Amino acid sequence: MKVYVIAGRAKSGKNTFGEMLREELKDYGYKPCVMHITEPLYSYAKNYFEWDGNENNKPREFLQKMGIEIIRDKLGKKDFLLNRLYEDIEILSTFFDTFIITDARMIHEFEDIKKHFDDVRIIKLERDHYDDRLSEEEKEHITEKEVDQFEHYDYVIQNRTFDDLKDGALEIVRNEESDII
């Protein structure tokens, strides 16, 4: 089983790229599944805190606080989100052979996923000169800063246009296919 981990700051195109990568992998005969480490946080926001699920009004401050300040720091459950992800992958691996995780941001996440699975590629998306509309506090949060401190990405994709993302997804799939042959 192959696992692709997509990293990047807010609004760098992680979900869009994940969908493009999924489509390219399907064209090569794979059965890919797009997943999110933070799925439990989104579930909490929707089910208990009245978020409507609209990406345009994502409760980023809530997600950051719940994931870091409460779950990791206050409750000491550093691996909570990763463990939930691993359980979901274990269950879903009956139906899928490739997993695309579109929201990794922490060095600990990259390292732990690489330890947990044998065949992992970590991809960073960069979107320079883009107004992400985050508050200064959100921009300074560890989940926005740590992604730039990791130095061992397998691929770095510059997101200037949709074509850049599509070309990057195709290039990665072709590179990975040539490694198999």
Where are these regions (language model features)?
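Post-Walker A helix-loop "phosphate-sensing" segment adjacent to the P-loop in P-loop NTPases
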Residues: E23-C33
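Conserved lysine of the Walker
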Residues: K14
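ATP-dependent small-molecule kinase phosphotransfer cores
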Residues: C33-F96
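Small-molecule kinase domains that catalyze NTP-dependent phosphoryl transfer to phosphate-bearing small molecules
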Residues: R84, H116, R121-I181
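Hydrophobic positions on the alpha1 helix immediately C-terminal to the Walker A/P-loop
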Residues: F17
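A short acidic, amphipathic alpha-helical/loop segment
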Residues: E109-K115
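P-loop (Walker A) phosphate-binding loop of NTP-binding proteins
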Residues: G8-R9
